[in-house]
């Protein structure tokens, strides 16, 4: 059996890229927000590994804030996606209001955790 992993990977990358090109701009913006939140969490973890985690509550609050915000944004993306049949009757304004309310609750809990 011939090994064509390079060609297969290139074909997979090309198909993913062409499928993502057809994604609406609103979903791409949400994806960018999720990527930024995860990137910020990774920066905090690297900083903690290099410098230390003396105020551990602050480090934990920052990372949980980033991860929680990313999870809520993924939920928003699922609800706003027009191809998703499960949330077809849910208007995008309602989904965004849910996102804002859940983000508010998340950050209130995180501020309470800080002390």
From Swiss-Prot:
Topological relation to the membrane, as annotated: Multi-pass membrane protein
Cited Pfam families: DAD
Cytoplasmic side: 1-31, 77-94
Subcellular location: Endoplasmic reticulum membrane
Regions crossing the membrane: 32-52, 56-76, 95-115
Record topological domains on the Lumenal side: 53-55
Function: Subunit of the oligosaccharyl transferase (OST) complex that catalyzes the initial transfer of a defined glycan (Glc(3)Man(9)GlcNAc(2) in eukaryotes) from the lipid carrier dolichol-pyrophosphate to an asparagine residue within an Asn-X-Ser/Thr consensus motif in nascent polypeptide chains, the first step in protein N-glycosylation. N-glycosylation occurs cotranslationally and the complex associates with the Sec61 complex at the channel-forming translocon complex that mediates protein translocation across the endoplasmic reticulum (ER). All subunits are required for a maximal enzyme activity.
Matches recorded under PANTHER family: DOLICHYL-DIPHOSPHOOLIGOSACCHARIDE--PROTEIN GLYCOSYLTRANSFERASE SUBUNIT DAD1
Name used for this protein in its record: Dolichyl-diphosphooligosaccharide--protein glycosyltransferase subunit DAD1
Protein species of origin: Citrus unshiu
């Amino acid at each position: 059996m011939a090994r064509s992993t390079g060609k297969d990977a290139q074909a997979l990358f090309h198909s993913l890229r062409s499928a993502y090109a057809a994604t609406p701009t609103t979903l791409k913006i949400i994806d960018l927000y999720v990527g930024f939140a995860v990137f910020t969490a990774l920066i905090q973890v690297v900083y903690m590994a290099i410098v230390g985690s003396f105020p551990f509550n602050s480090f934990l609050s920052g990372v949980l804030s980033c991860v929680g915000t990313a999870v809520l944004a993924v939920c928003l993306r699922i609800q706003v996606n027009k191809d998703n049949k499960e949330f077809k009757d849910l208007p995008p304004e309602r989904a965004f209001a849910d996102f804002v309310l859940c983000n508010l609750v998340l950050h209130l809990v995180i501020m309470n955790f800080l002390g």
